[in-house]
A protein has these predicted regions:
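Hydrophobic/aromatic residues within transmembrane alpha-helices
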Residues: 16, 53, 66, 121-122, ...
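Glycine- (often His-adjacent) and acidic-residue-rich active-site loop
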Residues: 55-91, 142-144
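Short, flexible helix-coil linker/hinge segments at the edges of structured domains or between repeats
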Residues: 81-84, 129-133, 137-158, 199
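Glycine-rich beta-to-alpha active-site loop
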Residues: 99-143, 166, 170-171, 175, ...
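Contiguous mid-protein beta-loop-alpha structural module that forms a pocket-lining wall or clamp
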Residues: 150-210
Length: 285
């Protein structure tokens, strides 16, 4: 059985490879524990200049926490509340905080699905590199939760309407919109991600400026064809820039008469979410 997460050291670079491509590299509790352990060691090691995190395969960086496996383990552990369920989230959030405060360059190569827990282990780092394959979402309201892993904080830095839309609907956006919203730092074509990794290993940069220089040499502008915001930003802000879920529902209802296909689809999505999750999610934005 292959390791769920692989740790390697090459020329002063600590490399984390999420290695569950058949499960879209979804995080398990042992993976979280191991990443925490290695980051603690690498942060103080004189032999490690920076860290790279990536996902195995060409489809997904990390599609989130493996909630199916977690639920099964929690039930086997005796049902909620359990030490396992509490420990998983505590350690996961500790990991997210550690990445956001990591004292060395932390480079996230999010070349594929980056959702939920995958956002938490990547987008708090100093360098977040997306490609045309990147697909971002915080879909927690669909399972009765709320955007966690620091995702609520990230979305809370955006325009209120945009942050609320992403949080409540769990909307998916790609690289152009991520760059526009400053949720990523760089865009590199997927065909160049391998070269970027080789250049980083060869140079072994120890400062953010040096990392920037290397990434910039391969970076380009993302294609706008997949943008949701170019054509829908204004109506999203009109519908979602409110303080309560009731106000958002009322506004979506009133705007539905104009027959905007995009907004009506977002409203239908909202209707299927947990009301409690929606209220908590909006409160944290």
């Amino acid at each position: 059985m292959s390791e769920e997460v692989i740790f390697t050291e090459e020329n002063g670079i600590g490399i984390i490879t999420l290695n569950r491509p058949d499960r879209l590299n979804a995080l398990t509790y042992p993976m979280v524990q191991k990443i925490n352990k290695y980051l603690n060691s690498w942060e103080i090691s004189e032999h490690i200049n920076c860290v790279i995190i990536e996902g195995a395969g060409d489809k997904s960086f990390c599609a989130g926490g493996d909630v199916i496996k977690l639920r099964k383990e929690v039930l086997e552990d005796g049902g909620p509340p359990t030490n396992l369920s509490q420990s998983f989230f505590y350690d996961e959030y500790t990991l997210n905080f550690k990445i956001s405060n990591f004292k060395k360059p932390f480079i996230s190569l999010i070349n594929g699905y980056t959702m939920g827990g995958g956002v938490g282990v990547s987008m708090h780092g100093s360098h977040v590199v997306a490609s045309e394959k990147t697909m971002f979402a915080m879909p927690e309201t669909a399972i009765g939760l709320f955007p966690d892993v620091g995702g609520g904080w990230l979305l809370g830095q955006l325009d209120k309407g945009i942050g609320a839309w992403l949080s409540l609907v769990g909307a998916r956006i790609k690289a152009y919109d991520l760059m526009k919203l400053k949720l990523i730092t760089h865009y590199v074509s997927s065909s160049e991600i391998g070269n970027l990794k080789k250049m980083l290993i060869s140079s072994s940069p120890s400062t953010n400026d040096k990392v920037d220089s290397i990434i910039n040499s391969l970076s380009s502008n993302p294609n706008s064809e997949d943008s949701v915001l170019i054509t829908n930003e204004n109506i999203i802000k009109d519908a979602f820039s409110f303080d309560t879920i009731e106000q958002i529902f009322e506004k979506c209802e009133s705007l539905s008469i104009i027959g905007n296909e995009f907004l009506n689809a977002q409203f239908e999505e909202l209707k299927h979410k947990s009301p409690t999750s929606l209220k908590i999610s909006l409160k944290q934005i």
